[in-house]
């Protein structure tokens, strides 16, 4: 028969067998009282705790995936954006340097020919405006013709039965007549606009031809400079469009990131509100901060304020230590002050004297490093009661 040896804690372990490790930061769970009839275990397995309900909520995993995807996209697109901006600045500096070098070689002919190229630019813009005005005028004419056809159809419907006036056809006729009037006004406005921009385009082209005759020699000498300038301008416009597109992608990814984060906060608030709505907190259940919360559960604010108000001016005496098996009575817990515990934790690096409170309080907070001593467990520095 295996020899039994006494170990600390009152348990007897046969010689040659290993004692299972005891994780000290886990709060012992109180045994669940079985209901009459032996159905207690089945009901406890069927009913999930709020913590398990949080972990099993599929919305959290889905929103976390959205959050991670948006974060990865933001990082990738921002890298591309930085590279595109660097390329744009490099091309801009290189073009300015080459244009300055070309201008120093050509001399004053560039300034003499500049009015001609400026007039060409204005003439090109006027030509584009003329094309846009022509498209608007054609659209207005099409709408006017369609409205007139609608009026014709409505008149035929009204005159179909001379003995009776159909209110539906009458309403359609009135509506079509209004459309004809609006389309007529739009057509006249488009026609006037087209005539105006056409005159401007003709004036710009006439000025270009006049300057070309006057500055023929300077234009010929400065042609390489302005051709190089037009080439660099086109390249810079392309890179500028790329930078603008990447900026829009970054803004959209950040918007998706914010939406996912907001959804996580809403889910956390819903879960926490559901937990606050429960009648009591089970003794063996650890209370954790909701997803996305800074520190400490919101549901314990009322309890914390009640303890602080009830224990104002009182606290635990220094040097009092609760053993592993000792549990504080109700009077001691009612006089426990959160401020006293916090100051005590700042003075010492061990919370050995708080182990007995695990059955009555919920410890939660950031983990501290390994405890000084022979045990390898971890303890919590900040607690919430």
Swiss-Prot record:
Pfam families documented for this protein: SH3BP5
Compositional bias (Basic residues): 376-385
Coiled coil: 59-140, 169-272
Region described as Disordered: 1-58, 272-328, 359-385
Biased composition (Basic and acidic residues): 18-28
Gene Ontology biological process terms in this record: intracellular signal transduction
A GO molecular-function descriptor: guanyl-nucleotide exchange factor activity
InterPro entries: SH3BP5 (IPR007940)
Modification Phosphothreonine occurs at: 13
Modification type Phosphoserine: residues: 30, 49, 343, 350, 358, 362
GO cellular component annotations of the record: cytoplasm
Family from the record: Belongs to the SH3BP5 family.
Function: Functions as a guanine nucleotide exchange factor (GEF) for RAB11A.
Protein name: SH3 domain-binding protein 5-like
Provenance organism: Bos taurus
Taxonomic lineage: Eukaryota, Metazoa, Chordata, Craniata, Vertebrata
Gene field: SH3BP5L
């Amino acid at each position: 028969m295996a020899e039994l040896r006494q170990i600390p804690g009152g348990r007897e372990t046969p010689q040659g067998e290993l004692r299972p490790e005891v994780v000290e930061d886990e709060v012992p769970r109180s045994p669940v009282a079985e209901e009459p009839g032996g159905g207690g275990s089945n009901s406890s397995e069927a009913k999930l705790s709020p913590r398990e309900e949080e972990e099993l909520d599929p919305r959290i995993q889905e929103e976390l995936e959205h959050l991670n995807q948006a974060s990865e996209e933001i990082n990738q697109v921002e890298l591309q954006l930085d590279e595109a901006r660097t390329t744009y600045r490099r091309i801009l500096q290189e073009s300015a340097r080459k244009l300055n070098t070309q201008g120093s070689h050509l001399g004053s002919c560039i300034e003499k020919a500049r009015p001609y190229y400026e007039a060409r630019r204005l003439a090109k813009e006027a030509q584009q405006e003329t094309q846009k005005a022509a498209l608007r005028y054609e659209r207005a004419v099409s709408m006017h013709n369609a409205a007139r056809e609608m009026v014709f159809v409505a008149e035929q419907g009204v005159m179909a039965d001379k003995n009776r006036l159909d209110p539906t056809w009458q309403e359609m006729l009135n509506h079509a007549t209004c459309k004809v009037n609006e389309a007529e006004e739009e057509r006249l406005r488009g026609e006037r606009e087209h005539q105006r921009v056409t005159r401007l385009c003709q004036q710009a082209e006439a000025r270009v031809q006049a300057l070309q005759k006057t500055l023929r020699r300077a234009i010929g000498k400065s042609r390489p400079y302005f051709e190089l300038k037009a080439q660099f301008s086109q390249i810079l416009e392309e890179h500028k469009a790329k930078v603008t597109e990447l900026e829009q992608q970054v803004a959209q990814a950040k918007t998706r990131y914010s939406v996912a984060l907001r959804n996580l906060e809403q889910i956390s608030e819903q879960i926490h509100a559901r937990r606050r709505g429960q009648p009591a907190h089970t003794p063996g259940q650890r209370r954790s901060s909701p997803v996305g919360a800074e520190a400490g559960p919101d549901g314990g604010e009322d309890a914390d304020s009640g303890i602080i108000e009830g224990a104002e001016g009182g606290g635990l005496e220094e040097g009092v230590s609760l053993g592993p098996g000792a549990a504080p009575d109700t009077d001691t817990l009612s006089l426990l002050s959160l401020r006293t515990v916090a100051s005590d934790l700042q003075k010492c690096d061990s919370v050995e004297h708080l182990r007995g409170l695990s059955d009555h309080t919920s410890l939660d907070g950031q983990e501290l490093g390994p405890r000084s001593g022979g045990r390898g467990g971890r303890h919590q520095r900040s607690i919430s009661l």
